[in-house]
């Protein structure tokens, strides 16, 4: 990972499943990811809170917004305030998607928290054809960023092949969300500022 990071000037986001993984990420990565299944792994959250690296905290599959924010508090209570929230879909009764991307959580979080929130339309749907429309929607409702699966040849991907975009699809997605961002950012920021004043 360190070689790739240096060769291509990339930032590395890596998921920690156990506390010792954080030691490795601190040496070779740039951001610690806490996945949905570990959102309430409190010892892992506390260890991430003692790190100097930013932490990307994915929402648990059945977590309320309050539970998600309280998980972030575990990290911040240890001194690490560099927490990024990631909406990645919740479990519902829907069978046409892998998960249900809760886009309403984005403006809700922006209203009650200072933390940045990004959207993962890849895991939020599990289907590549839905990623771009939901990425556009995520940016439109005020997401601070996106997490998108991309692979040169999705059919050969070792994981998450069904939800991965090709590089050309990703390039088109970026064009589209940048246009939406230009229009919606002033509105989203105004909403966040109004909340802070109120």
Specify the residue positions occupied by each region the protein language model found.
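Glycine-enriched alpha-helix->loop->beta-strand junction motifs that scaffold or abut catalytic
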Residues: 24-33, 49-55, 76-82, 113-116, ...
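Alpha-helix-loop-beta-strand connector modules within alpha/beta enzyme cores
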Residues: 1-12, 47-54, 103-118, 163-187
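N-terminal active-site wall of soluble small-molecule enzyme domains
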Residues: 1-29, 41-44
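Conserved anion-binding
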Residues: 37-104
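Catalytic cores of alpha/beta
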Residues: 20-28, 65-71, 126-144, 152, ...
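Glycine-rich phosphate-binding active-site loops on the catalytic face of alpha/beta enzymes
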Residues: 36-40, 138-163
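Hydrophobic faces of well-ordered beta-strands that scaffold small-molecule active sites
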Residues: 12-15, 30-34, 55-59, 83-87, ...
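Active-site/ligand-binding-proximal alpha/beta "capping" segment
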Residues: 76-141
